[in-house]
């Protein structure tokens, strides 16, 4: 399954494609039939008000598949793990009651760039993981996946993040090993996370061709 991540303040949608709606870009909760799930706004999850915000989002997206969240803003190195787990447990229990899968995303820097931290939190609160390929160096991707594989629900697909920008693949030479491994662990939801429409469509075309040949 291939989806397109909506990452625009204008809130564009592809009427004929599955969409992951980025509330961190456009906070309006749109409920079109082709929207599978949502990416939450970036919040300080140590604060109780963030619990209220996430529960309100979940209440409003009932009937959709998942909500992906960041554990922090990408720079935090010191995390109050106990309070983080306490707050996320409340959010995840509410998500489960509403049949929404809560997914935590690995980031390029900070606490959740460490796969051991990600899997510890996911196991502790019994939630899922959004595996962001481009947030992980090429030579660490398979190791990261191996540690987190039991909890991965979906993946963000693009070449790599550099200087805060998601780069598109020119081909799938670098992505094929991790795409193979994701399919091997039954992660079949590839969400293309790019900003440029032409880059999105070109990447989608390459992934479609790749999926025809995967064995």
Feature roles, as predicted:
Residues 8-10, 25-28, 40-44, 71-75, ...:
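Active-site-proximal loop/turn and secondary-structure-junction residues that shape catalytic pockets
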Residues 103-105, 130, 191:
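Generic enzyme active-site microenvironment
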Residues 43-58:
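Glycine-rich anion/phosphate-binding loops
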Residues 2-3, 8-16, 29-33, 56-65, ...:
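Histidine-acidic metal/acid-base catalytic patches
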Residues 35-38, 131:
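Active-site proximal beta-strand in glycosyltransferases
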Residues 62-79, 103-106:
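Active-site groove signature of glycoside hydrolases
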Residues 51, 81-82:
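Extended recognition/assembly regions associated with phosphoester-bond processing machinery
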